[in-house]
Structure formats: structure tokens, C-alpha cells
């Protein structure tokens, strides 16, 4: 692979990583602590991730347990969870916060699968846009630097192969997450 395509490969990898991060936050009927990754709590005036102010564990397949390191943080964490869009109501016993995940209904599983496919399609569009940018850049620098038409065509083919590789990776991620969601 030509080194001129490296910046575009990096962008495609970032797109794939972003998709996988989004998928990590989608719950599949099991407790997944990644669902809390984007939540922030006010810790002495500083918005902080829950994982930095509490111990987050999964004691049972459908429960997340949050044990703040300071008792004063229980209310703040509970407030952050209630204000979020994760759709789980926390139970607070004064020292611990528990999030119990209900079983997903068949309808909810199908809705999640649609969302997963939609996000996968958006990632594929982003990868294709990166390919378009790569080809435009190749043509522009090719004219400026006097690169032969054959070499430009070869670079375009490499960009297409790179795109095909990342589209296949996106498809694999979509299939794996859909399978995880739809498995009862």
C-alpha cells in the first residue's frame, strides 16, 4: 500500500472505531458497563466520568453495581443516570447504586437491530466519502507532481481496495452486533 494513502486509512480506522464504540453502548439484554461511558457527574465542580469517582462492576448478568468512593457522590451519580437517556432507573440504598436491566422484548430487539444497521450504513457512507477524498487528493497531487496516469490509476485502485476492506469490516461489526441483539 502506498504511503500516500496512510492518512485516509487512519480516517477509515477512526470511523470503524467510532462505530464499535457506539455499538459498545447498545445494551443487548445484558449489563454492559460501557453504557455509562458518556455519563458525567459533577465532582467538586468538574464534570467527571462515573468510572473515575466510583467502582463499576457487573455482579450479575443483568445488573450493574456502582459503588462511589465518596458517600456524597451517590446522589450525584443517581441524578446523572436519571437525566441520561439509557432508559434504566437506578435503585439507591445509600451506599450502592444498582441498575437492573430488564429482558428485551422481541419488538425492542428488532428496533435495536434497525438502529445498528442504520449506524453501520452511516459508517459505510463515511468510509466511501473518505475514499472520494483520497481519489480527489490523488488526482490533484498527481497533476501537480507530474505522476503518470497509470500510477494514478493504481493509487485509485488501492484506495478502492482499502475501502472494500473497511466496508467488509463494518459489515462484520453490524452482523456481529445484530446477532448479539437478536439472540434471546
Swiss-Prot record:
Location within or outside the cell = Cytoplasm
What the entry lists under Gene3D superfamilies is as follows: 3.30.1360.40, Ribosome-recycling factor
Query: What Pfam families does this protein's entry cite?
Result: RRF
Protein name (Swiss-Prot/TrEMBL): Ribosome-recycling factor
The protein's predominant localisation is cytoplasm
Keyword Cell inner membrane found:
no
Give the UniProt keywords, A-Z.
Cytoplasm, Protein biosynthesis
Keyword Lyase, does the record have it? Answer: no
By sequence similarity, the record places it as follows: Belongs to the RRF family.
Amino acid at each position: 500500500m502506498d504511503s500516500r494513502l496512510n492518512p485516509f486509512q487512519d480516517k477509515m480506522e477512526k470511523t470503524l472505531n467510532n462505530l464499535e464504540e457506539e455499538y459498545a453502548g447498545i445494551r443487548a439484554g445484558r449489563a454492559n458497563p460501557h453504557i455509562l461511558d458518556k455519563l458525567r457527574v459533577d465532582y467538586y465542580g468538574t464534570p467527571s466520568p462515573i468510572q473515575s469517582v466510583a467502582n463499576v462492576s457487573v455482579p450479575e448478568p443483568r445488573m450493574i453495581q456502582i459503588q462511589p468512593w465518596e458517600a456524597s457522590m451517590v446522589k450525584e451519580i443517581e441524578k446523572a443516570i436519571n437525566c441520561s437517556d439509557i432508559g434504566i432507573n437506578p435503585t439507591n440504598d445509600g451506599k450502592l447504586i444498582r441498575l437492573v436491566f430488564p429482558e428485551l422484548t422481541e419488538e425492542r430487539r428488532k428496533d435495536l437491530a434497525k438502529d445498528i444497521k442504520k449506524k453501520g450504513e452511516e459508517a459505510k457512507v463515511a468510509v466511501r466519502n473518505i475514499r472520494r477524498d483520497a481519489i480527489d487528493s490523488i488526482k490533484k497531487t498527481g497533476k501537480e507532481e507530474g505522476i503518470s496516469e497509470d500510477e494514478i490509476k493504481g493509487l485509485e485502485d488501492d484506495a478502492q481496495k482499502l475501502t472494500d476492506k473497511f466496508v467488509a469490516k463494518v459489515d462484520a461489526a453490524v452482523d456481529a452486533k445484530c446477532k448479539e441483539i437478536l439472540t434471546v
